[in-house]
Structure formats: C-alpha cells, structure tokens
Regions:
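Short alpha-helical donor nucleotide-sugar binding micro-motif in glycosyltransferases
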Residues: 119-122, 127-132
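Acidic donor-binding loop of glycosyltransferase active sites
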Residues: 130-145, 158
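Short hydrophobic beta-strand element within catalytic cores of glycosyltransferases
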Residues: 159-162, 172, 179
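Conserved catalytic-core segment of nucleotide-activated headgroup transferases in glycan assembly
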Residues: 7, 21-119
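Helix-loop-beta element that forms the nucleotide-linked donor phosphate-binding surface
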Residues: 1-23
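Short glycine/serine-rich donor-binding loops of glycosyltransferases
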Residues: 147-150, 168
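A short acidic/histidine/glycine-rich donor-binding loop in glycosyltransferase catalytic cores
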Residues: 176-189, 196-203, 207
Length: 210
C-alpha cells in the first residue's frame, strides 16, 4: 500500500506479528447441565438439531438475518427425522428493529423453529454455546475486522459456517476449521457515492458501514 501510495518501496525492519484476539477455552468446556438448560429453555429434545447465531441484531452493522433464516429452513427441510431450532442470541438497538427480526423469522421459516435469546444474559449465552450443534454467522458488513464468535464456536467444539468475508477469512480455514460461504461484493467504483457522503459528513459512520 505504501509503495503504491508514495511511489517508494518502504524498508521496514520492525516486525509486527499479528496476535489475534483469543478466548479462555476452559470457559467453553463441555457442560452437560448447561446444554440441558438451553434445550429446556427452547423446548428442544436432545435429538433435535440446534443452530446458533450470536451477535448484534442489526441489519446494517452485523448480519442481515434472512439468509440465515433461509439456511436454517433449508436444514430443517433436509433433516426430515430431526427437528431444527435456530437460536438467535443477542440484542437489538431498539424495539422496532427487534420486531422486524421477529417478523422476518416468521416470514422465512416454516419447519425451523427460531428462538431469540437475550445476549446480556451470561448464563443463557453460556448455555447456548453448550446446547448448540452448529454455529452460523453470515456477517456482511465492512466493519467485521476480526470476528470473535467463530473463535468461541471452535472453543465450544461447534462446526462453524460463516461468510467468506473480511476477518472471518483469517479465523476460519475453509474445510478445516469450518466452512466459508462465498460472498459477492460490488465492483470497483460502485461505492464512491457512499464514500463521498461519509467523507463530506452527510452520513455518519454507522450509516456508512451499513
């Protein structure tokens, strides 16, 4: 980047190793009681298949839920002999957005059961990690620079299905530590108008990243 921007190849002797964010894996060790607690909370039997998403409930600054609802519904239609539950753990910034999540869940799922869990309830979040069978996060916003939840999913022993996007590319090795779903981005130049609105101060950062 510096060479392209300045026209001079920089010589940097200082090494800057990347030390990613980590988790205390002992907190995610198998906990049968917590697993049973989550399944009782959502009405899931032990043989049912539970998918977990954990993150902010915001369309523009985390992940649009509809692709995840469709994915859960697709699994439910394939697993004819097992009931599928999709647990959405997190919080919405306001009641209007939360209601839109509820409405879209009802509109896009029929066989899969969608459950919403308070992301500020530490005990229930812990139980969610333990009670799930798979982790799903199709993040699609430009501020997802790292993404800690796939690391937590791996610590909990859950197979992770994530979008092939931004920081998730660094934490999930496709086919080895999880599965990355291909994404599509606009062609170069398409974002000029949005960048201009942000740079000129007409849009704030929150709107820009959405």
């Amino acid at each position: 980047y510096l060479e392209r921007r300045l026209g001079v190849a920089p010589k940097v002797d200082l090494k800057l190793p990347i030390i990613p964010l980590g988790v205390d894996s002992s907190r995610y060790a198998a906990d049968a009681e917590a697993r049973a607690r989550l399944r009782k909370h959502i009405g899931a039997a032990e043989e049912d298949f539970v998918i977990l998403f954990l993150g902010r409930f915001t369309f523009h600054a985390k992940a649009h839920p509809v692709p995840m609802y469709l994915a859960a519904e697709g699994v439910a239609r394939r697993l004819q002999d097992r009931k599928v539950h999709f647990v959405m753990a997190g919080q919405a910034p306001n009641e209007t957005i939360y209601q839109s999540y509820l409405d879209s869940a009802a509109a896009y799922t029929e066989k899969a059961s969608v459950h919403f869990v308070d992301g500020q309830d530490d005990d229930l979040v812990h139980a969610s990690w333990q009670g799930a069978d798979a982790f799903l996060s199709l993040s699609d916003n430009i501020q997802e620079t790292f993404g800690l939840t796939p690391i937590e999913a791996m610590a909990a022993g859950l197979p992770a299905v994530v979008s092939d996007w931004d920081g998730y590319k660094d934490t999930i090795v496709d086919g080895e530590t999880g599965f990355r779903i291909p994404t599509v981005t606009p062609s170069g130049g398409d974002g000029f108008e949005y960048a201009y609105l942000y740079q000129s101060g007409r849009d704030n950062y929150d709107r820009f990243v959405g």
